[in-house]
Amino acid sequence: MKKISLLYTLCLSLLTSIFVGCSDWTDMEAKSFPEEITSDEYYAALRAYKQSEHSVAFGWFGNWTGEGAFMKSSLAGIPDSVDIVSIWGNWSNLSEAKIKDLRFCQEVKGTRFTLCFIITAVGTQITPQNVYDTWEEKGYSSEQEAVNDFWGWPKDESDKEAVEASIRKYASAIVDTINKYGYDGFDIDYEPNYGNRGNIVNDDNNMFIFVDELGKHLGPKSGTGKLLLIDGEPQSIKTRPEIGHYFDYFVIQAYNSSGDSNLDGRLINGGGAGPGLIQTYGEELGEERVTNMTIMTENFEAVDAAMNGGYPYTDRYGNSMMSLEGMARWQPSNGFRKGGVGTYHMEAEYGTSPEYKNLRKAIQIMNPSSHSLLKY
């Protein structure tokens, strides 16, 4: 890892005063953002830190409203040093409050926000509602037939050219949606082995076509600076490992992880969740790059898990802790830097004291500053 310069150390030191000394702003209504509380120099340092090489902090944010008496439902309430947030639900038809909330965090804090939903088949999530509302009167035999016709999915699936054109049309529409709302990229939730199957994810070749089209506009091959992430089961795309070149990060749902050995297995040599990421992508991308791209995440949907920092976890030296802390302390056994850590339903941790206590601690563990980010 490159050494963080004095600028970044200053940024992280300033975070202490904001999180600990000026934490009252987190109780404000979302309509009163804290632009006046911190200096331009602080925010410049914060944005510079996020451009540096480091293990990132990530989260899926749900129940977003952008307003309310408390900031649990606002992006502005997320700790400043979180790098990437995937919007889980409530991502369309943005209100003025949501737009203001999103733009403040993007432009001032430098946080990047990705649209996220489960990918199964062509049309998922973005087929116009009128297609579903009018299929009978238009003479289709089923709702699915109407959806397929809208996207150009052929009745004869042996027509590979038509299949590819349909997939690319759908992927292009997702990019248009991202640009419409001003998100910073897309997080593909890919979980075909957990009941989320369809004509894209059932076939590695179709999945490759889908990602290739996205990759023209998102991810490291696009040159746009926009993000392309894949979460869920990226290790399962075994027949097309070259797909890995299109992604910025692999986000692994290492929920209720028992310890370092579990994380090493998910990354390196496989286990109960299938092959390790390196088994799938190592030859194509190299072991170091795969490791640098890997973000391990814990599930905070359960209130107890959010309040406590996850589940019991034991590191390779026999030390016991909670799982989010364990993920932050985890050093992959291959010796390379991990991509980072994160939480699902990160907003559920807002009720800790200070807010997002466990995620802040994880950030401090991975990227220590000269001062603690929170009071222990």
Residue map of PLM features:
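Bacterial N-terminal signal peptides that target proteins for export
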Residues: 1-9
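C-terminal motif of bacterial Sec signal peptides marking the signal peptidase cleavage site
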Residues: 17-21
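Secreted glycan hydrolases and related glycan-binding modules that recognize and/or cleave
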Residues: 22-376
